[in-house]
């Protein structure tokens, strides 16, 4: 990987998070000249350091993608927590559901991995690629789309030219805004409070989620025996919970999780992330593609955000490589629409499903409370339907891009 003064590229990827870096990896060692841009330097990773506050529940499909990119071996050898079961229940009734990876013949339902470690493993792959140029830090200031290329102007005065501009710079994507692609979005007025805690009882490689009227709380197993708490609350109570002292926070998590792992005995400092629903009106324009959170954002109650983004990346990489192999213009709108057809409807279905679940479980109208409890019990007992839900959440159903198979 180089840091050159070149200003002309085949693909410029704005945003060097998990999805953007993964796309660069998918295009490494090809005859395409790739640039990655980010406002920050890549995050530093040190084995044995305190775990990153941001951990992801990677689906088996995401694991396969990272394996195909050559990053999984580093992740597996460093720090990963597979979970084989998941238990979900409603705080205001007797509805509950139990998912087990054995029911669908998979070794795990998913894998809890630090955001920082995933990026580190991907960057190790990029370091050996001679067709990748890293331009960090760099901030886009203007975009001009021409017939044959995009000109991307940076705040430091540089100008980059590319056949294809990919926006992977998050839900507040500056690139998407500069291009002028609209979104349908709504703030939930909630925050996800995140911390790593120690509990009296072992997590048994199980993820736990309890739906409270105020928002879901999830306990995700970590490799070192702790669990990662992801607790979604309205803004005001979230701030109260976040600022509790350690003892009071541990007691609050114990109560909210119904003591499923016994008392919470220790905690890290807390972090908070604002929650919203967002979907771009279009994923592509001539010479432009959106991917990951730049195209969509979802409620974290099912941990699907990064998994959706990695599937986006895999589909876009497939479209780019297929076009290049056929000597077609990788920035042509007819080429890029293949990517939009592959991902937009699928992502919309997931966004609406998660939004519906969020609203259903936060509504205390008696008929809806009865409906969700009856529904949970029914799905738990009807194995074919439960298996279908599991395979969908695990990224194992539908038409998958080659990297995810």
Language model features with spans:
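N-terminal Rossmann-like FAD-binding beta1-loop-alpha1 element of flavoenzymes
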Residues: 9-36
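Conserved Rossmann-like nucleotide-cofactor binding loop
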Residues: 19, 42, 172
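FAD/FMN-dependent oxidoreductases across multiple families
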Residues: 239-331
